[in-house]
């Protein structure tokens, strides 16, 4: 393998912003993202041409190589010449499987263009649509590569049919662009095959665009003939139409440079004061301005420690310089600066605005951190939080086979969470078990494999269980919560938040850290809130619950405001029914009595008082359990629709839509996550292995009333609690 053949050129080009492109590759699982990456690496001199297409170079973990799938988002900086001019292509290869989509979504924040890879036979699938939707919401411009033309030729053969199939895929992608892109980009970003969207075979390393077809005098019938003549003919096609030429030429031509992209992306992804000095530097991607960087990825290097990777929006990241972490609110000194080449980091003295860089020694940085020059320490608003589409709803209890390795396990779990925040680690206070939650069973399996491969830990894991949510369906009366010393009282009611409010929060339109007047205006106009209540929001938590302060003139309340908010957050983490997280509840503080002496109003007094009042209201407001629901997108021959319908019904699911396509059908359905563990085997069995499908998290839905109390009892028993939920009297003040 030839490593870093052009690193010196790369470091030169990164100073010229017009010659930089930041791109990602997104697709449904197994549509060929990493195979495409290999070919691009090969062309850049970073991978032997002989093994490109098979190496999976950006899949650098053992588990990725073994499973032939991408688990992490991997970076590489590539050198490419277009019309005699050198360009730096900062490339991120991302996972396609639904269980790892948080990594893809984080990558979309720091790129300006996305190569959307679509399997020519399978077409646009669930994850294709989901990632394209998020990309468009982030104002990331899509370009298209229709892959696996070799497979399409074997199935269709006719050049005319192949062309019709390609046109249909372009139409499907354009429909999504017209649906999800902001109005100002809907027409400009529509794909036009005549202008250069690419098609080809990543495995066989050839690619073409219509302009290249015309330029090289290649006909569709010529391509079909190649696959009847054998390997030598395919090798000739590789030489005549190299894949990297079609793809990277398309990228240079249609993906904007960082400066042009930041001018329209900054107002979308950064919601601070647009009159702030930093804005003009970010809009121009000015390398001479103060540093502003967004961290999108954290890796734990066994030798170097924590490595924070992100996009520099303004200024220059230099080794040895002190910077400020806005979310963590701490200064840190950058030890080293480097750019990524797959699993390798190449050191640099400095990296300028518009580029993707890795920094060593930012030990307090986490994914989503905003890193700025020290001069912005007190004035910088962090970048908007990323909106995650999935939720971590599958949990296993784990313990080391060797009890002496418990400390090592705790450290390893902490590091896995740093790298992947959607892996959530908790300790069951009742049983002392370590609980690991992930998006799905594969997510958990990969985490357990990493514990073994990276940290040498053999662990025992329980069967997977589902994480539920608790909520209320009615408003409660006001209840009193009294502190243990009887000196502090809180008068609280609870109510369900309406669907529009939940939508605004889940889409990141309403957040805790935003201008209160702007938030109140949105709640009034779009969610029907009372004007007074809309102005008085104290806190919003991660599970879409709100705390509203409707008190007037309560002495000393301001002094304990943070403690009250913390008490609210703790109560929302474990509800009264089954100690599951609470979702979609409005907690209203109507009145309070607060002791004048700080010694009598500490957290030990305030937390239980707030919790008891909330839980008393909760139990009288028609409480219920919400279960996570999956959306299934199934492509199947027509004759299997009845069989699929039967499986969905058995799984407590429902058919949402059945669409007839050219030679098959598309079935959209929903099933509870709790019923999904064997769905793959069942669908394969009833369709003779001829169906293909994808899945994604859809929504939270109340469990059927007939199952509610039995489910509550099972959850509580599993957690080592009494089977019966607490009674109202348990939370009433004596």
UniProtKB/Swiss-Prot annotation:
GTP binds at residues 27-34, 93-97, 147-150. One of its GO terms (molecular function) is translation elongation factor activity. Keywords: Cytoplasm, Elongation factor, GTP-binding, Nucleotide-binding, Protein biosynthesis. Disulfide bonds: none annotated. The modification Diphthamide is found at residue 600. It comes from the Archaea. Residues 18-259 form the tr-type G domain. It is found in: Cytoplasm. Pfam families: EFG_C, EFG_III, EFG_IV, GTP_EFTU, GTP_EFTU_D2. GO terms for cellular component: cytosol; ribonucleoprotein complex. Catalyzes the GTP-dependent ribosomal translocation step during translation elongation. During this step, the ribosome changes from the pre-translocational (PRE) to the post-translocational (POST) state as the newly formed A-site-bound peptidyl-tRNA and P-site-bound deacylated tRNA move to the P and E sites, respectively. Catalyzes the coordinated movement of the two tRNA molecules, the mRNA and conformational changes in the ribosome. Belongs to the TRAFAC class translation factor GTPase superfamily. Classic translation factor GTPase family. EF-G/EF-2 subfamily. This is Elongation factor 2. It comes from Desulfurococcus mucosus. The lineage of its organism: Archaea, Thermoproteota, Thermoprotei, Desulfurococcales, Desulfurococcaceae.
């Amino acid at each position: 393998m030839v490593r870093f053949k052009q690193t010196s050129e790369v470091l030169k080009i990164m100073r010229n912003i017009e010659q930089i492109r930041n791109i990602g590759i997104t697709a449904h699982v197994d549509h060929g993202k990493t195979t495409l990456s290999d070919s691009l690496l090969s062309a850049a001199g970073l991978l032997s041409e002989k093994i490109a297409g098979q190496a999976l170079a950006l899949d650098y973990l053992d588990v990725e190589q073994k499973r032939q799938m991408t688990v992490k988002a991997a970076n590489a900086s590539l050198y490419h010449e277009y019309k005699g001019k050198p360009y730096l292509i900062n490339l991120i290869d991302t996972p396609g499987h639904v269980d790892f989509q948080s990594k893809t979504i984080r990558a979309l924040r720091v790129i300006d263009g996305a190569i959307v890879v679509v399997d020519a036979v399978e077409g646009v699938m669930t994850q294709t649509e989901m990632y394209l939707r998020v990309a468009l919401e982030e104002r990331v411009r899509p370009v298209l590569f229709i892959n696996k033309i070799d497979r399409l030729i074997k199935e269709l053969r006719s050049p005319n049919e192949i062309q019709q199939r390609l046109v249909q895929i372009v139409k499907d992608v354009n429909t999504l662009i017209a649906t999800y892109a902001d109005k100002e980009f809907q027409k400009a970003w529509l794909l036009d095959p005549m202008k250069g969207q690419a098609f080809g075979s990543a495995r066989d390393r050839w690619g073409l665009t219509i302009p290249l077809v015309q330029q090289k005098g290649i006909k569709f019938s010529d391509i079909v003939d190649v696959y009847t003549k054998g390997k030598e003919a395919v090798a000739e096609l590789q030489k005549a139409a190299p894949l990297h030429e079609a793809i990277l030429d398309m990228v240079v031509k249609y993906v904007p440079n960082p400066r042009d992209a930041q001018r329209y992306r900054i107002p979308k992804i950064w919601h601070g004061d647009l009159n702030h000095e930093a804005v003009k530097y970010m809009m121009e991607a000015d390398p001479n301005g103060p540093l502003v960087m967004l961290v999108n990825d954290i890796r734990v290097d066994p030798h170097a420690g924590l490595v924070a990777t992100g996009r520099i929006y303004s200024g220059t990241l230099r080794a040895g310089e002190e910077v400020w972490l806005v979310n963590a609110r701490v200064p840190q000194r950058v030890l080293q600066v480097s750019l990524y080449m797959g699993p390798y980091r190449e050191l640099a003295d400095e990296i300028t605005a518009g580029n993707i860089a890795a920094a060593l020694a930012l030990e307090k940085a986490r994914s989503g951190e905003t890193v700025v020059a020290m001069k912005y320490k007190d004035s910088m608003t962090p970048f908007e939080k990323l909106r995650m589409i999935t939720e971590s709803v599958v949990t296993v209890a784990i313990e080391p086979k060797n009890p002496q390795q418990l400390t090592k396990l705790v450290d390893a779990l902490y590091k896995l969470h740093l790298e992947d925040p959607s892996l959530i680690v908790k300790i069951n206070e009742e049983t002392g078990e370590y609980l690991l939650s992930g998006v799905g069973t594969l997510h958990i399996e990969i985490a357990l494999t990493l514990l073994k491969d990276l940290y040498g830990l053999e662990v025992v894991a329980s069967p997977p269980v589902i994480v539920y949510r608790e909520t209320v369906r009615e408003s409660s009366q006001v209840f009193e919560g009294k502190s243990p010393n009887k000196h502090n009282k809180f008068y609280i009611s609870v109510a369900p938040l309406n669907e529009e409010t939940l939508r605004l929060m889940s889409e990141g339109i309403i957040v805790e850290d935003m201008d209160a007047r702007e938030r109140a205006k949105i709640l009034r106009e779009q969610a029907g809130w009372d004007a007074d209540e809309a102005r008085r929001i104290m806190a919003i938590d991660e599970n879409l619950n709100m705390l509203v302060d409707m008190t007037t003139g309560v002495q000393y309340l301001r002094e304990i405001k943070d403690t009250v908010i913390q008490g609210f957050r703790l109560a929302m983490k474990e509800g009264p029914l089954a100690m599951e997280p609470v979702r979609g509840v409005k907690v209203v503080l109507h009145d309070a009595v607060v002791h004048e002496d700080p010694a009598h109003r500490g957290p030990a007094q305030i937390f239980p008082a707030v919790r008891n009042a909330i839980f008393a209201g909760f139990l009288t407001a028609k409480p219920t359990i919400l279960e996570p629901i999956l959306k299934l997108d199934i492509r199947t021959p027509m004759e299997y629709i009845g069989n699929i319908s039967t499986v969905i019904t058995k799984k407590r699911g429902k058919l949402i839509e059945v669409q007839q396509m050219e030679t098959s059908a598309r079935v959209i359905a929903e099933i509870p996550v709790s019923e999904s563990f064997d769905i793959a085997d069942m669908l394969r069995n009833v369709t003779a292995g001829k169906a293909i499908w994808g899945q994604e998290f859809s929504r939270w839905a109340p469990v059927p009333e007939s199952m509610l109390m039995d489910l509550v009892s099972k959850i509580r028993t599993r957690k080592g609690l009494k089977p019966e939920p607490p009674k109202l009297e348990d939370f009433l003040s004596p």
